């Protein structure tokens, strides 16, 4: 009897399991284009049990699979924004393949949103897709205004972060848009044209073809446009004039302003009269698209990043390497504007085209030019604290910089046949920079006016030019069997710079009675050349339907020559008859080579992927500094592991673990003093070893399809062995260099140190608040870092604990009312390990927060109210510091023309005249407050015009565009940008 019962139970269990083992597969495509629809929701409802529902979202190519289905009859519904919902009855028996399901375009967006709130977000592997219709913005908003409302995405001063990582590139319908300039791309498209926004991890060109992730990818955003807006002309244009009564937007002057040595030459950073003209036009004709963007203003509006190949802003330059011989990574040269007030002019053109059968030949290119003239008056207060000597520095400065950039990016793809393809990337950039600056400061004891006294002065005038060219060529072959591939690529890069500078700076000799430093005048010429050559060979071999092996070899060579010829002159900087000063002149040659080889393994099944690589790398450094040879060899083993796991269609986790090395360069290793600044001497360390870094990133995303909620968690950790840190000695006495005695304020060198850590975690949660028709995004994070250094031959650890929180409430009511309310705050607690117990300055605590609101309201008969309020506060708990200001911009406007595509506005920028540019920095042994120039209150009038002409899908004729072939009507007219609100 027992055996019979057990047998019956087993049969029941098997029967139940079989009943739930059914699966349904299908491919969802656009009826007209036959392209796969990614991110569509497919829902099955059991007819025998209506409470039983299962759903999934379509992946690559529109494919979808739903598993765990009991055999029986189901009602199927397929939904996606911009398409009529598809319904059908299906019968599931075992594995059921529906084949191709076609969606018909043309449903009203609101109808779909009302039907299923789930259309906020969807997931497919490591891609999170946001449906634009679920985040309503004003009719004339651009893409940047749209993505700010999406959970997990933040935009701060033009820098875009998604899921805790910086976004390096923007794609439009899968094609690169304006190269690496994310800011320009986001300001070139109207939000109305966007169907969805996809955040994904973009693989390198090599990894994308072979399928073997090599760890050189980056975070990117793909903007998918509405299918009925891919044929037409659209954009926005604007023109405005303003007047500023009070043009003194500089920080307060210090008490030593009238010193004889400091002679200000920048009278005003801005002018009474303001102008702001610009716009963008997009011409989409099937496979061929042209976008043009332009900007001209003197109100500091810079909706682009410029390419700093000279390294003049402190955000880049200084070398081609971000790793031995591999050149800079994506976006590494792109920096945001400098401090101050700028007159700006820019123009950019983007082109995308495809030809041949199945678009076998593709071309993507962009050209961008920008010119800025930036003026700034600055004020700096710096406290040197324990473990540094208790000194206090006050410094005042001014600068004027003319900067010019040209950059050209081209990508060419040729699919030779089904097994072979060729791809090339060409980048050409030119930069010109003419900087002028001078700073005057007084260094005193712990309390201003007491103790020791030094005068610091630095004046500089120069001219720099740089050109950068790179060519990347990749040949890819499928060897018949699926997964068996060979990829060969090579890269050549060239960078040449030439800088001519005159400097006057203070030495340690001071005429204390007259409060005048003894100045040294130097004229220098600094040419620099770099060449980078690399080659890569990757072979992949499938070992099963789900797994693949690879073998990769990579070679990198970097040749660098840096020369500086400097002359000590008189006040006229005349070098006639002078010999170069040996202590200030130098010639550095460096040749670096790296060989890297290693196997890899990839497993992929469904939406789950694991990639693992191990590399052996051998590096060689051969250099010469001031006639001294430097030779080093380094051998390392590095690793890479990436896994992407989908628990179900709503829960995915991605883990990224890798190691990498940083080899010291010849300047780190040189056993020669740098005496170019006698107050701050430095020297290399020939005993330096390579640093070895371990890094881990984890991303978890959960999307609640039914309730439209999105939760994200990010965790990252970094540990560095043999960290290359600074060793600083203060007031080091009697340093004998070539018979000259130096007594610098600070002497520094490099040392290998252990104990560098950086941990960060961040969560974000976004959900709709239905009663008030809004979307609420909440986020919070914690960051802890510990950086080792040596101070007066003692080990010091600078630990910083940072907490941040953010709240954003965005309207989702209609295009006639668009508002966002935001708050974000950060609290930092920095400590120095050399400062014990309750000693003064044992810890440095400060808090900053910002509360802001933006409103665009279209009300009675097309009148508009546009406003922005921003409150900033900085609180220093350690030194009882409090700085706050409130900025308020208000504009009243009126919509014009039949379709309200025009708008006239009048208003005021910075109504309360409180704008400030303030920054607080905490480092190893110091705290610094800095102020820079800003634009104050001004009154303005502006005209905007939104260009919208869309034609028949698939039409090749300009006459088919709505409104383009009509007689009369309103011609294109300037307008479109939001009112002049300086960033």
Report each predicted region and the residues it spans.
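Short, ordered, surface-exposed loop/turn motifs in non-cytosolic proteins
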Residues: 32-47, 121-123
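Short, acidic Ser/Thr/Gly-rich low-complexity loop/linker segments typical of extracellular
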Residues: 47-63
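Outer membrane beta-barrel strand-and-loop segments of large Gram-negative receptors
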Residues: 396, 532-534, 578-586, 683, ...
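A short, solvent-exposed loop/turn motif at the edges and junctions
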Residues: 48-51, 73, 77-89, 119
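Membrane-proximal, glycine/serine-rich, low-complexity loop/turn segments characteristic
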Residues: 13, 20, 61, 77, ...
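Surface-exposed loop/turn segments flanking beta-strands in extracellular/periplasmic regions
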Residues: 126, 302-331, 375-394, 441-456, ...
